[in-house]
Amino acid sequence: FAYPCGNTYLGRDKKIKSYVPVVRKLFSTGRTFADISSNDLDLDFARLSCVIMDNKDFKSIKSQIEHAREQGKWLILGGHEIGHKEIKTDYLTNIEMLEELLDYIKNPTNKIWTAPVGEIASYIKVNNKN
């Protein structure tokens, strides 16, 4: 499940309620959005952190990847509209950055596993002994 705009709560003021318990019951995973860090492997599968790629360059995304690798964490990247940097919007995942990113993660010497969220979550659930 992808939380709309990363929001895990509904309502306002005193009536605000988390719908994470509903997501936990109905879905194998729930992904937030625009978080600043990657996921520890001892995590809440109903609230997976997702780091935003919008308006980022390859150098900053690569730094996030390397940090997650060094820490033994799972990095989920997310973005919105994909296009060229000439498009002026706050929610643009730059296609040139994506091309660099894809070249980097496809290179076998970098040893980066990419897969759908559900596949990686299943692997962690089976193999994480914590």
Indicate where each model-derived feature is located:
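Catalytic domains of cell-wall/extracellular-matrix polysaccharide-remodeling enzymes
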Residues: 1-62, 97
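C-terminal domain-boundary segment and adjacent tail
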Residues: 27-43, 62-69, 76-130
